[in-house]
Amino acid sequence: MNYVPELKKYYKDSVIKELVKEFEYKSIMQVPKLEKIVVSIGVGEAVRNKKLLDSAVLELAQITGQKAVKTKAKKAIAGFKIRQGQEIGAKVTLRGNSMYEFLYKLIHLALPRVKDFRGINGDAFDGNGNYSFGISEQIIFSEIDYDKIERISGLNVTIVTTASNDKESKALLLKFGMPFSN
């Protein structure tokens, strides 16, 4: 028997039924589901110190369990001394089982470790059912050893769903246990 993450099992067993009842879908295929989660780090100082970018790639790989890809500047910005095509960040796109594992770890282990945590903003949806938020410190993840990091940096997390609007997407994430403050 293949391994199925706890959150994926919960989605199939409970969340689908609850959302069908709540939004009165005609078919279970209309129920929104998670498509992917993109975790990224922007490292502006990578212009001067390449070691910081390598450190960010390593940290993302430790946090997500998947190899990170370096991202490049789309256009030159003279004020930041950035040239087009210069590597200035890293990202990981999670799908399938690793996506559900990361979401479980984020909701139940990492976010509760944030100092004075009162929930995340529930209004950061993009109008198409996708949700993005920032994490100010990567050290909330247990995989990161505080003594071995170059510097404390933040992460961007984007959760892409198949929901057609923000209301359905928020309901889906609430069923997964996302701690919204509003």
Swiss-Prot record:
Keyword RNA-binding tagged: yes
Gene Ontology CC: ribonucleoprotein complex; ribosome
Superkingdom of the source species: Bacteria
InterPro entries: Ribosomal_uL5, Ribosomal_uL5_bac-type, Ribosomal_uL5_C, Ribosomal_uL5_CS, Ribosomal_uL5_dom_sf, Ribosomal_uL5_N
Keywords: Ribonucleoprotein, Ribosomal protein, RNA-binding, rRNA-binding, tRNA-binding
GO biological process, one term: translation
Pfam families, per the entry: Ribosomal_L5, Ribosomal_L5_C
Molecular-function GO terms, alphabetical: rRNA binding; structural constituent of ribosome; tRNA binding
Keyword RNA-binding tagged: yes
Subunit structure, as described in the record: Part of the 50S ribosomal subunit; part of the 5S rRNA/L5/L18/L25 subcomplex. Contacts the 5S rRNA and the P site tRNA. Forms a bridge to the 30S subunit in the 70S ribosome.
Family: Belongs to the universal ribosomal protein uL5 family.
Chain's role: This is one of the proteins that bind and probably mediate the attachment of the 5S RNA into the large ribosomal subunit, where it forms part of the central protuberance. In the 70S ribosome it contacts protein S13 of the 30S subunit (bridge B1b), connecting the 2 subunits; this bridge is implicated in subunit movement. Contacts the P site tRNA; the 5S rRNA and some of its associated proteins might help stabilize positioning of ribosome-bound tRNAs.
Name of protein: Large ribosomal subunit protein uL5
Native source organism of the sequence: Borreliella afzelii (strain PKo) (Borrelia afzelii)
The encoding gene: rplE
